[in-house]
């Protein structure tokens, strides 16, 4: 009898605690977490829409696909960002999900909706996941239709798609005849989509503005241009800091592909701009042929990421293929490279071919170095040679400049390069002063250091 009394008492207390939790605590939904076992046996498609706002930045609300009413935090008058992931061969949640949600909410009180289709993307058979992309798009179309019926507008819809998610975003856009506000494709998937007609992949007509980042065109990503503007960091292939051999395991396969996401996330913080240069090829960019962005005045050259839509009015007027833009990055967050033009006017009587290495030193003693190009520069008497220099640190102000000239030859005589004028022009931060040095000699393989001075005539 006593045992029964204690049991009933515990049961009563348990009910009180349960009742108290139901009133004071809300249920937080999380991204589906699967494993390699699920990948092997396969998963049926199930889509979960996880809503985050500034009112619930860490506790996602699970939205009903067929009903956009009755949700505590969904405000259809806000701009809504749909974030859609891609193929998940191991079933684990994307490592970048929490970070991208937080960064969006730091900028503005969006409706941030994570499109969790991990059940459907988790499989060892990539073609099965690819086949589900249309089905996911159909589900998103139903939900957006409900939002529109509650007062949302297509202008306020922004879709960010990663890999297969980029094509899902495109399929949604097609169902609205390209009227949704914006699509950003982050390294759209290449396998099974390369060479397909526009109706079977992401296309620039799928939204009012489509911007695309290509970071693994020789692997898992799509190579050709797809948007109004296509960004190719580091030429769109081997990303700095990523493994170069298969000995690194899975990182070798996914690092380049994922870099597009991390570059985009870096753009949300705006700690520095990832400035890109419209150009026909990566080689043309590397040799400094593509730094004229007068066509975008009063704006500067386009920047990758969230703020790329500032260039929308210029870009959407162009015929397809649209604008391809190239730039280099550093190996680590925030990935920014700071560009300078280095102009040499030489007075050596003989033509010299060689390589230039330049170091910049700040007032506090920090040093950053740039080897200007993989190809030898040609220095002719009284003919200006302009080289594009790239640094992974921002030096302001610059207290000293060091320059080394080399021909790359290990045998034979050592040459001199007689410099009439060297000019350092900031390109990333164009409001900074142009610096010069006049009448000096570079001895091959000898580092020459000097204090720069303001140029006598910046029009030279």
UniProtKB/Swiss-Prot annotation:
Residues 1-24 form the signal peptide. It catalyses: 1-hexadecanoyl-2-(9Z-octadecenoyl)-sn-glycero-3-phosphate + H2O = 2-(9Z-octadecenoyl)-sn-glycero-3-phosphate + hexadecanoate + H(+). The keyword Cytoplasm does not apply. The active site is at residues 163, 187, 257. The keyword Protein biosynthesis does not apply. Pfam families: Lipase. GO terms for biological process: lipid catabolic process. This is Lipase member H. It comes from Xenopus tropicalis.
